[in-house]
Amino acid sequence: MSEHRQSASGPASPGEDLGVLLAACCERVVRTVLATLGPAGYGHLTPTQAITLLFIGRGINTVTQLAERAGLTTQAMSKICAVLQADGLLDRQPHTDDARSRRLALTADGRRLHDLLSQAGADAERAWTDLVGAQTLQTVRAALAAYAHSPEPAAPTTQVRLRFT
């Protein structure tokens, strides 16, 4: 399989802005994953709600932890969790280590949705692998992880959030 393919608009230019390319890739993956939600009855969920469910399913289980991970205020994340709870996708339970905190847990419906989101993400990744090849995607993943997890030289003064409409 070819390690480089031309897109419908032509080959990627070496000088193409990396930030724009990353945002476009992220948006495409999010759109692809969210497209699976409508037929399953969850077309009303926002990208932030879907990502929150994925985080909870992967063990991030307090509003404070979720807010830090998502780059939101605890108040905003609390509202997102309230909507997910009202939709029957998560429960708030007493936290065993902190009486002031609540532990978030997926309901049976929340676990089903988590599994659907995880499968849709895996399908999107397979499509990317088919496009560029497994070795290229592995290299891209390693490069992104190295950059994402490296210390920032200076903390930004404001948080940056991408919005996918």
Predicted regions located by residue number:
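N-terminal helix-turn-helix DNA-binding core of bacterial DNA-binding proteins
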Residues: 32-73, 156-158
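Alpha-helical linker/hinge and terminal dimerization helices associated
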Residues: 22-25, 29-36, 70, 113-131, ...
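C-terminal regulatory/oligomerization modules of transcriptional regulators
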Residues: 1-13, 135-165
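N-terminal leader segment of winged-helix/HTH proteins
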Residues: 1-44, 165
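Generic structural concept
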Residues: 23-26, 57-60, 107, 141-144, ...
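Charged, amphipathic alpha-helical coiled-coil/dimerization segments
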Residues: 4-6, 82-145
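N-terminal positioning helix adjacent to the helix-turn-helix/winged-helix DNA-binding module
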Residues: 18, 29, 48-49, 109, ...
